[in-house]
Structures are given as structure tokens and as C-alpha cells.
Amino acid sequence: MDSFTTHILVVDDDDGIRSLVKKYLNENNYLVTTANNAEDAEEKVKIIKFDLIILDIMMPGKNGLQFIQENKKRIDTPIILLT
């Protein structure tokens, strides 16, 4: 992946973790979009083609594993799970 054109979705309910991951990725020239829950992430993947999704497993409401189960046929993007 070319970091100058790689678009990453970071999904985490913790503002601090989401901000930290975004800051690190931005400093390394990745384009980053964030979502604070699985429902917000689902809306974003409907309109944007991401190169990678970094996804928290434990979130209130729909968790990361439920997001994967419900979207695996529609999304072919690699996913990294955070715990």
C-alpha cells in the first residue's frame, strides 16, 4: 500500500484511542477517517471505499465482531481488530 493514497477507517468508541491512532497514521501520511461506533462505520463504508479498517472489538451497541459478521459479504476491505 502506498501510504500517500491509503485511506484508513479507524473505528473506536474511546476518543483518546481514536485520536491517538489517527494522529500516528496522519503523521505517517495516511488519509484517515474516524467513526465512534459500528453504526457510524457502516454508514461511512457505504459511501467511501477504504483500503483498511482498524476496528475496536469491544464497543457499546454493535461490537466489532458483529460489524464484521453483518458486513462481510459487502465489504472486502482488510480489517485489523483492536482489543
Task: Map each language-model feature to its residues.
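Active-site residues of response regulator receiver
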Residues: D12, D56, T83
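Acidic catalytic/metal-coordinating carboxylates
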Residues: N36-D40, N63-Q66
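Conserved phosphotransfer cores of two-component systems
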Residues: K46-I48, E70-T77
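Conserved sequence signature across two-component system core domains
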Residues: V11-D12, A35, I53
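Receiver (REC) domain active-site loop signature in two-component systems and cognate sites
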Residues: M59
